Amino acid sequence: DLFMETMEQAEAPRIGAAIQANALMMFGTPEQQQQYLPAILRGEAMHGMGYSEPQAGSDLAALRTSAVRDGDHWLINGQKIWTTTWWGKYMFLAARTDKDAKPPHAGISMFIVPMDAPGITIRPSATMYDGTFANIFYDNVRIPAENLVGEVNDGWKVLTGALAFERGLVGGGIVLKVAHAFEQLRAHVMAGEGDQSLAGEPIVRDRMAT
C-alpha cells in the first residue's frame, strides 16, 4: 500500500508489531485488543515471535515447549531459538497444551508472554549479517490465564494465520525494496556524462535489462 511504499522509498526502519497486531485483531478478545493494540500502534510495545525450537524448525507442529494450566495461570516450560525480537516487551509464543493430541498440531495454543516475567533466560547470539537472535529458555514462567490468544488447543489456526499475514507483509516489502533499489541504481548509471557515463557500457545495459 501507499504507506509501505513511502516507508521503503524513505529507507525507514520497520516499526511496530503488525503481525501480532493482526493476530490480535483476528483472534484476540476485546480485552486483549484494548490492552495491547494501542501500545503497538504508538510504537511503545514490540512483540517477538516464539515459534521455532531445537527440534521444531520448519515442522512447527513438533514443538515441545509446554503450557500447563495452574489455577488462574499457565506455567510455561521449554526453549525457543532464532528469536530476533528477543528484546521486545512481549513474546507471541506457541506452546503445547496437549502432548497426546493427534495430529500433533491439534494440541498447540498461543500465548502472550511478558518478557520481564520471572523464569525467562535470554542468550543472544551474533549473526553473520550483523544482527542478533536469541535462544530463550522458559523455566516455570507463570502468566495469567487471560494471556491465551484464541481457544485452548486451537493455536494452530492463530499461528498459521499470523504466518500467512507475515508472508504477505514481508513479500510485499521485499518487492518494494527491490524496486526502490533498482531506481537508485538506474539514477546512478544515468548520472555520468560522456566517458564517465555507465549507461553507455554494453555490459551495464545488458545487466540492467535483465
PLM regions: where:
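Residue-level signal for inorganic ion chemistry
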Residues: 29, 111, 138
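Short Gly/Pro-enriched turn/cap motifs at secondary-structure boundaries
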Residues: 55-58, 82-85, 100-102, 125-132
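Glycine-rich beta->alpha junctions and the first turn(s) of the following alpha-helix
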Residues: 119-210
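A structural signal for short hydrophobic beta-strand segments in well-ordered beta-sheet cores
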Residues: 67-68
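Short beta-alpha junctions and helix-cap segments that line functional grooves
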Residues: 36, 63, 79-81, 122-125
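A short core secondary-structure module
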Residues: 79-122
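Internal helix-loop-helix
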Residues: 1-46, 83-90
